[in-house]
Structures are given as C-alpha cells and as structure tokens.
C-alpha cells in the first residue's frame, strides 16, 4: 500500500477566499519522485482546518524530498495557504484509501493507545470496528486504518460516509458498531473529524 502523508493546519484567509492559492504547491510536489496523487479539504466541524492527503509510493520517497535542498521551495509555495502550525503524520493503511477519500465526507479518527493496553489489542479492536462498519456502510468499503510512522501507538482510521449525519446515525442505531466503539474507547483515546476531500488535478 502507498504511504499517505497527512498535513493538517489552519487554512489562511487567502485559501478560504480562493483555494487556488494551494495549487502551485501541490502542482510542484506532483512532479516529485514517488508522488502518486493528492486530496485536500476543509474540516466540517470548524470550517477552517485544512487537510492535505498526499499518496507516496513509500514513506522514504517523501522523506527524501523533505531532506532535499529543493524542499524549501515547496515550503515557500505552501506559505500562502498556511494560517498556523502544521501537523504532519504518515500512515500505510490496511487497504487502498481511495474509496473513503472520495466519499461525500470522510471521518478521520486519531486513536491513541492507553497505558496498560497492548498495540495488538488496539489493532484488533480497530479491525473489528472497521469490519462491522463495512457490513452496513457498503458504498465506501473498505474503511482503512494503520499505525502512524511517527508513533506506533497512534493509529489513523478513515471511513467514508454519505454525510456527518449518516456517521452519527450508524453509531447511535447500530448495536454492533456502538458496542465495538465502546470496546475501542476502553483501550484508547479517540478524536475524530469529518472532511469532504477533493482530488487535486494538476494545472494544465
């Protein structure tokens, strides 16, 4: 599976007025060795946090770019879109994330292991929840998950939904899903957001 870079930061006022200010940066990175494709979107909850999801052949391809002297040029191109601190994480998901990122909205959950629990127990709980969600939420299977490169005890889970409301309803009305969410919360700390991603098309 590809390595996916998630870069998350407050969007600048310039981006919120015109998302095209981001295009020069993504167009530049789209020519980098190992780049596959990218998606971007504003978080539904706060209407101002920008999420970039860039697919790479491997994590090492992006690492090589970040360590190159050309990387400063990319940062310069990104600056007009950035309105605050940038948080970056990398993950190799359990399956192809294309379907969940092209859903009308994507749930991005950050799941951190609690003290006293094993990574394997967390992974098992996430797998069971993911499997249960996919049985009912068939339009956007498979949901995907994986540990971050930066911290093996932190997992990202991505699920595609028709809407934020559809996600809420699935948890409230699905007995299996509700129980499995409870099991996962017993061994982890979970935070999540929803992002309607768009695929980036290189400028002609």
Predicted stretch roles:
Residues 1-204:
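Short S/T/G/P-rich N-terminal loop/turn motif that feeds into the first structured element of a domain
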